[in-house]
Amino acid sequence: MKKIFLLISVILFIFPVQAQYTLRLMTYNIKNANGMDDICSFQRVANVINNASPDVVAIQEVDSMTCRSGQKYVLGEIAERTQMHAYFAPAIEFDGGKYGIGLLTKQVPLRLQAIPLPGREEARTLILAEFEDYIYCCTHLSLTEEDRMKSLEIVKSLIASYKKPLFLAGDMNAEPESDFIKELQKDFQILSNLEKHTYPAPDPKETIDYIAASKQNATGFAVISARVVNEPMASDHRPILVELRTAEKADKIFRTK
């Protein structure tokens, strides 16, 4: 890991005409804002996000217009409380509405794409958001290893043509020592801290949530910090926050329009 950080630092160093800025990536399985105290609170989830101050958040387990959520657009409720843009990708029809994943972003994406993924217990999906300088993907993978492996092949095929730094975030339903994570690491560098558990939130004993970077374009950034946010109550998962230092051309950093 030290060698990787040193290499990335060198890559940043050899661009003296570029400025540097930070990018804060987050992933959070919010359990539809239902906390461990059985209280549904959009504001509590929003507070967790606001305190972390991310640029983009991968959200898992979120309803849209379901009866159990009072026919509310849950992601929109949280977006309103965080002053972020909301993008929802349904995975299944559920309880009079839809259930799936989403993104919260400070910056409006240039392009969005939702891709169905296999899941024998329930359908899964991936949402890809392309920004000017990077790509952020959110997913919530199947409980079944075979489905996760098939999903990974779909993801790898999808991202092969992209040249920008690309990040994959979400609830992978697999622990670091699993065959799936070992396979994932062939093509992705995991940026989040594998030694810090994310589930269950009150007393985490498993690491099943991740933020990773595609190795094919893993240049121009360095990890400043990677942590699991200490939030035991708002959901059954704890969120992950990764902060990156990235190299950017000065004319983009200091643009006035």
Predicted regions: what they are:
Residues M1-T22:
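Bacterial Sec-dependent N-terminal signal peptides
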Residues V17-R81, E93-G97, E153, R245-K257:
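N-terminal, active-site-proximal structural segment of metallo-dependent hydrolase catalytic domains
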Residues A19-M26, K106-L110, E122-C138, L244-A250:
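Beta-strand-turn-beta hairpins that frame and shape the catalytic cleft
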Residues L23-I30, V45-S69, Y136-T139, V155-I181, ...:
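Active-site beta-strand/loop signature of hydrolases that rely on acidic residues for catalysis
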Residues Y28-K31, Q60-V62, A89-I92, T105-Q107, ...:
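Active-site-proximal beta-strand/loop segments in catalytic clefts of secreted hydrolases
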Residues D37-D38, V62-Y134, G220, I224-N230:
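Structured beta-strand-rich core segments of catalytic domains in phosphoester-bond hydrolases
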Residues N50-P54, A79-Q83, Y87, P109, ...:
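Sec-exported extracytoplasmic/periplasmic mature domains
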Residues A114-I115, E145-M149, S157-F167, N173-K257:
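Metal-dependent phosphoester-hydrolase catalytic domains
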